[in-house]
């Protein structure tokens, strides 16, 4: 069995880790970074960039660079209006009212884009481990719905990974924190403020058991929103100064986003920062530059409501766990946004002066925890048990559009529960089971997960038929619902996979397409390497021709020029196969070897001629040397004659 990797698939950055020698370690990407931007860029020629390379070209290719795709995965069109307005790339309605992105006339699902990021992480892990990677544990925000969890799992499948487990991000961070502290009984609160989501989880640690007591959160709160506040402030100020609305310029908007993120990071360690964006736009009077000063106090004023929004989920989680702030032993910070001083101060104030524990890296803790869980599943870690919970209540719609809960939130998973229902009208022969997730009283206010029909119920008076509805949640938090007529034994079930209309066949098709694209990426990389080799050989040939052209025979020059023409032709042919390119390269290299041999042979012949001339009485200085850069043989003349004086030497201290 190969290594199982742990992946933190984040909104703004992703990270991959593996267990080595019983300890989790982060795997650096091919660019040397320990985290990889969750960004995918599409070039004009069809090339696809992922991670740091995609981020570098985002300003000049804003409409074809996809970021924050995690905010769309497994969500409906009508639920994402705010997110769609923020991004420069095109969003279109997918099947079943989901959100797809449109790039150069082609639609991609969020699962496909996420799979491209996962493929990059998978490739980096394979390069590090030196072996193929086929299995992974992937983390999701604790407050992800069933549809979002299933969509994330589909993304892993498309990327060519068998997703052994989906675990919650705060739970993974707790694993990273508590791996070496399993003998200590303690209650910890994980405060996870990432790029796009916010989660709070309370866990009890002890005797190798990590038990989640309660979880709460907000899937629409994260670092992106903090950046957005700064962007809005810059747009407003620039409009006041220059009477130009930068919100209408997608390239300018992308520059503003990058500047806002940079300013936010700098203000975590500085009292103020300068924002300078030359040539941000232009009008009839000429180019315009953006120059602003942003103080930490002003930043905290801009994001005050967002910081306040982190308090209620903590109150809710403590209430659900029947705990008070003083009962918490450790507070763990996870996610880059927890570095913001105002966030930390709000947390310290809420816990009456208790400072958070800083023993884990906020950017890497989740991936490290995922690697630990991967080690558990791979048999590398013993005596560790993870007991997670379902973050939201699950149930069905009943008479009067009421949401009837079957599994309450914060129930430990895996779990299964059932409840008996009956018909609402006389003679009813079928019932529609409408499955919902949420906490509101009315069905319409909760998240719809799916519907199915149980037909063939014998006609009877209302309230007589007995229909048992069973809910089963697996270890990944993914739901299966069944309904059975107790009178006839007739049964119908559904596994909730309504994550954007992706059937099993479609997921498999996308996986095969991703493999083809990965192969195409590999081919492009090898093609670039071959072109670089060809460029080097052409430079060597030109240098040889310049320095030793008179020593190269005309016949071999003609042959070499033919090979040069062939090389130049294949370098400009995008359809050339790697095998053909390599063959042309090998042929040209052999020609260069022949030229080298020819140069040395002629140089030696010319040197022999010079020696003959010198034996006729000529001085070596009388001979012109047209050869530059060629080797001259070493001459061993015997100078011991009558005019040579022999001397003894004595060393003097």
Swiss-Prot record:
GO MF, any single term: unfolded protein binding
Description of what induces expression: By stress conditions e.g. heat shock.
Family statement drawn from the similarity comment of this UniProt entry: Belongs to the heat shock protein 70 family.
Gene3D superfamilies: 1.20.1270.10, 3.30.420.40, Actin, Chain A, domain 4, Substrate Binding Domain Of DNAk, Chain A, domain 1
Organism: Nostoc sp. (strain PCC 7120 / SAG 25.82 / UTEX 2576)
Function field: Acts as a chaperone.
Xref: PANTHER family: HEAT SHOCK PROTEIN 70KDA (PTHR19375)
Modification sites for Phosphothreonine: 197
InterPro entries the UniProt entry points to: ATPase_NBD, Chaperone_DnaK, Heat_shock_70_CS, HSP70_C_sf, HSP70_peptide-bd_sf, Hsp_70_fam
Protein name, as recorded: Chaperone protein dnaK3
PROSITE patterns in the record: HSP70_1, HSP70_2
Keywords: ATP-binding, Chaperone, Nucleotide-binding, Phosphoprotein, Stress response
Pfam families in UniProt: HSP70
């Amino acid at each position: 069995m190969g290594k199982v990797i742990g992946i933190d698939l984040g909104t703004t950055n992703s990270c991959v880790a593996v267990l080595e020698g019983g300890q989790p370690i982060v795997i650096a990407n091919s660019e040397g970074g320990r985290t990889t931007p969750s960004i995918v860029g599409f070039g004009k020629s069809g090339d696809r960039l992922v991670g740091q390379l995609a981020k570098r070209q985002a300003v000049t290719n804003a409409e074809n660079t996809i970021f924050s795709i995690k905010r769309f995965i497994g969500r409906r069109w009508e639920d994402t209006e705010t997110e769609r307005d923020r991004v420069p790339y095109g969003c279109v309605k997918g099947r079943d009212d989901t959100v797809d992105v449109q790039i150069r006339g082609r639609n991609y699902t969020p699962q496909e884009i996420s799979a491209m990021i996962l493929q990059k992480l998978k490739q980096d892990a394979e390069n590090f481990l030196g072996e193929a990677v086929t299995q992974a544990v992937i983390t999701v925000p604790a407050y992800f719905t069933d549809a979002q969890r299933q969509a994330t799992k589909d993304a892993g499948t498309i990327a060519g990974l068998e997703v052994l487990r989906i675990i919650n991000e705060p739970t993974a961070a707790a694993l990273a924190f508590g791996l070496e502290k399993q003998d200590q009984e303690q209650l910890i609160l994980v405060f996870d403020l990432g790029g796009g989501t916010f989660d709070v989880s309370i866990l009890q640690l002890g005797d190798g058991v990590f038990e989640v007591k309660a979880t709460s959160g907000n899937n629409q709160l994260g670092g992106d929103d903090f950046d957005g506040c700064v962007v809005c402030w810059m747009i407003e100020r620039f409009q006041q100064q220059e009477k130009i609305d930068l919100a209408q310029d997608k390239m300018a908007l992308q520059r503003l986003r990058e500047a806002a993120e940079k300013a936010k990071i700098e203000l975590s360690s500085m009292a103020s920062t300068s924002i300078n964006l030359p040539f941000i736009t232009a009008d009839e009077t000429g180019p315009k530059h953006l120059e602003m000063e942003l103080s930490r106090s002003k930043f905290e004023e801009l994001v005050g409501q967002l910081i306040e929004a982190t308090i209620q989920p903590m109150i809710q989680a403590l209430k659900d766990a029947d705990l008070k702030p003083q009962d918490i032993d450790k507070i763990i910070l996870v996610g880059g946004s927890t570095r913001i001083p105002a966030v930390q101060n709000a947390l310290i104030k809420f816990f009456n002066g208790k400072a958070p524990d800083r023993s884990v890296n906020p950017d890497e803790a989740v991936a490290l925890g995922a690697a630990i869980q991967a080690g558990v599943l791979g048999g590398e870690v013993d005596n560790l048990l993870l007991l997670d919970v379902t973050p939201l209540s699950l149930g069905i719609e009943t008479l009067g559009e009421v949401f009837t809960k079957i599994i309450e939130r914060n129930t430990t998973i895996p779990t299964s529960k059932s409840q008996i229902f009956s018909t609402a009208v006389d003679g009813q022969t079928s019932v529609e089971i409408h499955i919902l997730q949420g906490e509101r009283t009315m069905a319409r206010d909760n998240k719809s997960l799916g519907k199915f029909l149980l037909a063939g119920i014998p006609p009877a008076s209302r309230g007589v038929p007995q229909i048992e509805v069973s809910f089963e949640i697996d270890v990944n938090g993914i739901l299966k619902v069944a309904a059975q007529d107790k009178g006839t034994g007739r049964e119908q079930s559904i596994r909730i996979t309504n994550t954007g209309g992706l059937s099993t066949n479609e997921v498999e098709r996308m996986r095969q397409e991703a493999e083809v694209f990965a192969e195409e990426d590999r081919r492009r990389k090898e093609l670039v390497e071959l072109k670089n080799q060809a460029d080097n050989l052409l430079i060597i040939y030109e240098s040889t021709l310049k320095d030793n052209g008179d020593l190269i025979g005309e016949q071999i020059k003609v042959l070499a020029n033919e090979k040069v023409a062939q090389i130049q032709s294949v370098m400009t042919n995008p359809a050339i196969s790697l095998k053909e390119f390599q063959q042309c390269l090998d042929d040209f290299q052999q020609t260069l070897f022949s030229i080298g041999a020819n140069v040395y042979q002629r140089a030696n012949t010319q040197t022999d001629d010079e020696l003959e001339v010198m034996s006729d009485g000529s001085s070596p200085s009388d001979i012109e040397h047209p050869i530059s850069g060629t080797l001259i043989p070493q001459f061993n003349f015997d100078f011991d004659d009558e005019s040579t004086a022999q001397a003894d030497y004595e060393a003097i201290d």
